[in-house]
Amino acid sequence: MRRFCVVPLLLVLVEAAQKSDLGGDASAALINHSPMLIQRLQDLFHKGNSTDTILRIRTANSDEVKVIHVHQLLLTLQSDIFDGLLLNQSEVTLQEPAECAALFEKFIRYFYCGEISVNLNQAIPLHRLANKYHMTALQRGVTEYMKTHFSSESAQGHVVSWYHYALRMGDINLQESCLKFLAWNLSTIMSSNEWVTVSDKLMVSLLQRSDLVLQSELELFSAVEEWISKNKPDAPVIEKVLRSIRYPMISPSQLFQIQKESAVLASYHNSVQDLMFQAFQFHSASPLHFAKYFDVNCSMFVPRNYLSPSWGSQWIINNPARDDRSLTFQTQLGPSNHDTSKKMTWNALFSPRWLPVSLRPVYSESIPSSSQSNRLEEGKPRLVVTSAMSGMDFAGVTFQKTLLVGVKRQQSKVFVKHVYNVHQSTDEVFDFLLQADLQKRTSEYLIDNSLHLHIIIKPIYHSLIKAK
């Protein structure tokens, strides 16, 4: 549970006036009894002394009416909506959904003390109330709470419902934050109760993305098939969803298997027949030869972020602030059946405090050692991934390195917080582990004092001169 503490407008004005009174007098002092005033305001609300307005809260399809006695000044000072509603009125009736009505007294208490507690189930109704009554600071506070609690445990899950709510409210920022979390933790979402609550629109949006983090494209197909079976969307939606699966990223043997065993694919075979045929063609030739005849500059041939060992390696770095670390691992050359047996070797180097050569200290007896040490402490985390197979040239393909940073293990799960795409080094992005503070054992980026990374190598194909 999180509490938001916002000083009411009245106290802000009082504090500003007090500071102005001090002027430049060095002997002046500020006596601050704001907490006592807040406590008295809370007591005023709880005891109902000297109230001048009555709020009646009704809920649709219910005869129950909640009555709250309030002080009009405190509401109208902070909400222009209440200012309009209570103009020349001492009693108003408000219609609220049941979940909002249940929290309305708590919401009104916020006007008196500037503080409110919130949990996962209360986030949407509180955000809705803050939005309706133009309580901007509270709305921002609840939004930030939601963004920092995507990975919190809940029985039914909550990020999908938060996305759908943000979509209805037109909150683009919250929508994007929810989408990003869902995309980067899709394997976890697909195995949770949330998966069947995904709407048609959200499913289509997710499947368009190349940054989905999951074990394999086959895992995605199986989860999508389950979603179709349980939700039974309209035929056009099913066709669009099935055509968003990247079949070339599935091996030929697995393609044969789903063709034979998938009931959904059997029903909609004609809708994806061309894509399946193209996938088999992709696997039957080298990517270089395939690119001469087909356009590979489309999403169908762009790998997503697959966690299986053939695509990269997990890297758990214990005590990452200590010193440089290195890792050597192998991946397949590419997803084509022509390349899966060919291996690429990669070297990764992690530096917790890296400085460009131009900024590195010059060690000299004339320069205090403390200054040299301070300069080193100014370095930032850096990760470089290079091929160990120097001199090899691959026409028509470049290798993108995708770096996943995991945080907040819950029930043995590691959630992805950041995804970085680089050609070789994190120097190419400005914010790699910028807020991590790896020297603090309490850093949210450290799980049992270890930094959890996953390196994925993604071959990106490019069209060549087409054969005539």
UniProtKB/Swiss-Prot annotation:
Residues in BACK domain copies: 159-259
Span of domain BTB: 51-120
The entry's keywords: Secreted, Signal
Pfam families given in the database record: BACK (PF07707), BTB (PF00651), TRAF_BTBD17 (PF23651)
Leader sequence segment: 1-16
Compartment(s) where it occurs, according to its Swiss-Prot or TrEMBL record: Secreted
SUPFAM superfamilies associated with the record: POZ domain
GO CC terms of this entry: extracellular region
PANTHER family in the cross-refs: BTB_POZ DOMAIN-CONTAINING PROTEIN 17, HL07962P-RELATED
Protein name from the UniProt record: BTB/POZ domain-containing protein 17
Organism of this sequence: Xenopus tropicalis (Western clawed frog)
Gene responsible for this protein: btbd17
